[in-house]
Amino acid sequence: MNAFKLSALARLTATMGFLGGMGSAMADQQLVDQLSQLKLNVKMLDNRAGENGVDCAALGADWASCNRVLFTLSNDGQAIDGKDWVIYFHSPRQTLRVDNDQFKIAHLTGDLYKLEPTAKFSGFPAGKAVEIPVVAEYWQLFRNDFLPRWYATSGDAKPKMLANTDTENLDQFVAPFTGDQWKRTKDDKNILMTPASRFVSNADLQTLPAGALRGKIVPTPMQVKVHAQDADLRKGVALDLSTLVKPAADVVSQRFALLGVPVQTNGYPIKTDIQPGKFKGAMAVSGAYELKIGKKEAQVIGFDQAGVFYGLQSILSLVPSDGSGKIATLDASDAPRFPYRGIFLDVARNFHKKDAVLRLLDQMAAYKLNKFHFHLSDDEGWRIEIPGLPELTEVGGQRCHDLSETTCLLPQYGQGPDVYGGFFSRQDYIDIIKYAQARQIEVIPEIDMPAHARAAVVSMEARYKKLHAAGKEQEANEFRLVDPTDTSNTTSVQFFNRQSYLNPCLDSSQRFVDKVIGEIAQMHKEAGQPIKTWHFGGDEAKNIRLGAGYTDKAKPEPGKGIIDQSNEDKPWAKSQVCQTMIKEGKVADMEHLPSYFGQEVSKLVKAHGIDRMQAWQDGLKDAESSKAFATSRVGVNFWDTLYWGGFDSVNDWANKGYEVVVSNPDYVYMDFPYEVNPDERGYYWGTRFSDERKVFSFAPDNMPQNAETSVDRDGNHFNAKSDKPWPGAYGLSAQLWSETQRTDPQMEYMIFPRALSVAERSWHRAGWEQDYRAGREYKGGETHFVDTQALEKDWLRFANILGQRELAKLDKGGVAYRLPVPGARVAAGKLEANIALPGLGIEYSTDGGKQWQRYDAKAKPAVSGEVQVRSVSPDGKRYSRAEKV
């Protein structure tokens, strides 16, 4: 055969191979397109599978608790016979078993799983449904446990979402819960919130007349004397704001204009002054003010600029939502209860945009909240630009379907395969700081470490690989966060492997931390607000499979998940660098590494001129006291669940010299549901609900007292006491972890309006709050130290202020807050309805939601057949969830 013939044959072979490859790729894409049209239905079968024949312990379920779920995939198109496919999905619960031998499910990382066919797979027949029963760990008590945007892949085809899961409307693919599927145990004493049970719950609330709210300020001042006359703001206000820097003065003027009170020279005069010498004793603190509102003018005297700003916010608090323009004349003396009144926002798990952050800061300022704890990094995302380390945002700032994770992190939390994410540029972050500074808010940046660091670890590995390939070995290792000798088998709280933890024993880890602190500190300086507090993070540096809910198969204990714990390691256990440090006596053991690292980071913090470090308390648990750290002050976010012993352990931290910022999950975690109803959003490991009333009733400076006013996770009473001294809390912070909020409106729904209850409790100590007494035991349902009548009266006032006045202001601020679902019943053929925040409008429908009518409690409508109810925002633009009575 001559050369020409060989060449022609080679070209023909190559062409056929190319065409074959094209054909294969087209076939893969066709298969993915077909799979994307499968309709998913998720149905909860049994949240207490262990009581009904499933051996959860043998399956290795934490605390031997598991549930059963049914996945149904319906095929309305042509038969699908191909086996070379994967469907990816997200779940906060570990899959323990698949009860259909045609399918298998494997865990990838975090909440990402893949569903694949086995050799026994017989296809998805045309016009038929295939059922896949699954056993998963724990419980799935709220429908948001079932995440959207399942997606299919095959070969090199472009991934594609299952169409009916590409939504935030869970009704499209998650079946309603039925019966007692919402219960965690058969003895669960929580009350399922329905229109009927809400009607009972709201029975002690009524709409107060406007006169009863006259002169009421939120948050409540220390002392107020309301006078008979009114001040008229209908011609606007003439503001003397010379005591404030211009950005703060502009904020005040803009707030008046937003609420319908124009700023003009012929308006009602409001004068301001700063006289620190006028304030004595407990009043001589930042933010204190005196306010005199007369018929002809008002005067605000502040201890400092913050005091002037807050006094003006108190005037704004009085402005009615109906635009009438008249406010009560009064005298007030006021000062904050705590120096730290905070909101924590996680933008790492799911990113939230700059505009949403600014709206949050607006509302924080209006309600005198002064600390913005900004969670900028976690396993699932890195959200701030760091000059010199572009990989942090190029890789760690976005998620997509890249199994190698060289261009992005893998998808999490139901986002789908497409590129998702975002980050704050250097200028964005400076803008946010300036915006906060103008509103008397300190920005506290948090870069979480040594655990919850996967985004940083993966990003720095991408950097390492790139520079290593270029032969720049020294530069490649400069900021590397892993010890390549470490083969530890660990599982983090949210099911990541050892990549979740940066290695605290490496010099390169310290260089990385120093670099990040330095760059962020420089941004703060340029913004005019030098960092006062650096947040170290520090939480959850552990292997959950070595936790109390698991037991080793060699000596199994009842009530626990049985696993082979001999294969489990503590974080960094097999790191040769860490092993050497322990041998040299630099640290006692692996358990002490997080606290050791916190001490080392505190030296870097101090070197950057930052006087205070803060952390989640478990990250510092092995340090002897706050004096073990280089900074002169150390704060802890105390997040022990109160009914599991937090009422006592909190004292230990205060007595060791830490500034305790009360952050208890069961009261002030705003990522938990508002009520016990499967249609609400949120995680619920600490409590099944935290509504505005529960947060309002929280006593942050006397933890045991809360046993009389609340229940545990299962709705049971509990007892609480501590025999230890209690020096007092430094502050109160409400947290929004963002795993369950993929959009900005979802974020705002979870924060507001309960953040207003946080503002009330952090600024004002109520008369019904008891002084802490060592040794006093509060027994839920038995003791009655708390004046519950005073508490209920106080809540009635506050609930009416929210419903009649403050929610309308949130409307004007563009905030997508949660509207409560009404309580309702039909009695003698007439609809009776009520609401948790009196003053909000209620609507009802008798035709399946096609038409809605306003409910009038004074003329209860006659109804028959199916009736639905919902509440409506004061501006008439938004509605609560509608429910059948």
UniProtKB/Swiss-Prot annotation:
CDD domains: E_set_Chitobiase_C (cd02847), GH20_Sm-chitobiase-like (cd06569). Residues 1-27 form the signal peptide. The keyword Magnesium does not apply. One of its GO terms (biological process) is chitin catabolic process. It holds the Pfam family Glyco_hydro_20b. It catalyses: Hydrolysis of terminal non-reducing N-acetyl-D-hexosamine residues in N-acetyl-beta-D-hexosaminides. Disulfide bonds join C56-C66, C400-C408, C505-C578. Pathway: Glycan degradation; chitin degradation. Residues 875-885 have a biased composition (Basic and acidic residues). Keywords: Carbohydrate metabolism, Chitin degradation, Disulfide bond, Glycosidase, Hydrolase, Periplasm, Polysaccharide degradation, Signal. One of its GO terms (molecular function) is beta-N-acetylhexosaminidase activity. The keyword DNA damage does not apply. Its EC number is 3.2.1.52. InterPro entries: Beta_hexosaminidase_sua/sub (IPR025705), CBM2/CBM3_carb-bd_dom_sf (IPR008965), CBM2_carb-bd_dom_sf (IPR012291), CHB/HEX_N_dom (IPR004866), CHB_C_dom (IPR004867), Glyco_hydro_20_cat (IPR015883), Glycoside_hydrolase_SF (IPR017853), Hex-like_dom2 (IPR029018). Digests the beta-1,4-glycosidic bonds in N-acetylglucosamine (GlcNAc) oligomers (mainly dimers). Monomer. Belongs to the glycosyl hydrolase 20 family. This is Chitobiase. The gene is chb.
